[in-house]
Amino acid sequence: MERLVQRMYCLGMRDPPPANIMAQQEPNGDFPYLPSGAAEVNRMIKENSDLFSDSQCKVCSAVLISESQKLAHYQSKKHASKVRRYMSIHGSEEPIAKRFKPSGDDQSNVDEKDKYKACSVCNMTFSSPVVAQSHYQGKVHSKNLRMQSIGSQTPALPQPEAQAKKDDGMQGPAEQDPNRFCSICQASFNNPLMAQQHYSGKKHKKHMNKQKLMETFGPSTAPASTVKGYPCTVCNIELNSVEQYQAHISGSKHKNHAKPKKGPNAFAPPPDNYQPDYQYPTNEDCLEDPAEWDSFNVAYE
């Protein structure tokens, strides 16, 4: 270094050499300096392990995935510039190890900084806060976060007594809550979000339409365990959808089966309250005065 200074003075330069030149020429001096070669890079990492490692540079928020990338990063001018800026802001009077050991009051701030370096939910690391912010606002993080919350709310196994009540047909408090159980589809939910997704889905709407049709046209005579579609007991067939069922009951084939049969065995006696369209009058109705009816009988004899 003395030779460099003497040479610069010989060239007429009265001012001291620039700081970056001193940094490059003094690898054994004060930090920061720009290392040259793998040995100096490893030495710098070892002496400043709180800031640098073989896989990460905390000053630049850079993740290093290979040996060549590590050497290229730590020997770059961009890295040296950020280190000088970091040291000018934080100062060098306080030991590095002490600066990076958070106290109890600063633990929340450290956690806030750590979330911009890695995401424990998605098991990812970030090279900068901008990349981290983009990840936290993305669909992948939202999906993994939702799946983690669902997994943490997994219900416990039912007790034997509760299971016996369920087998007897008695509904518990959870089965009476629509956010926990759908009595129409016999489906249970872990949280209100799953319930909302179920109620807006096609399967639930299909069962709702089926229930309305059964209430309108009457229940099926077939066992409930074998009924998977929309049965017509008149024609003894089963339809797959609401549209097919409505088209069937509006068709001529169904109406022909629904009409009363004609033939010798098709006659049925009238009901007790049957009233004919025309009633024949009696004798009393024809002759209002009974004396007139007696005179009519004498004249006839």
UniProtKB/Swiss-Prot annotation:
Region span, Disordered: 151-177, 250-283
Amino acids binding Zn(2+) 1: 57, 60, 73, 79
Bias type Basic residues, positions: 251-262
Main location: nucleus
Subcellular localization(s) per the UniProt record: Nucleus; Cytoplasm
Binding site for Zn(2+) 2: 119, 122, 135, 141
GO molecular function annotation: double-stranded RNA binding; zinc ion binding
Cellular component terms (Gene Ontology): cytoplasm; nucleus
Top-level taxon of the source organism: Eukaryota
Keyword Zinc: yes
The protein's role, per its UniProt record: Binds preferentially to dsRNA, but also to RNA-DNA hybrids.
Protein name from the UniProt record: Zinc finger protein 346
Organism: Danio rerio (Zebrafish)
Taxonomy of the source species: Eukaryota, Metazoa, Chordata, Craniata, Vertebrata
Gene name in the database record: znf346
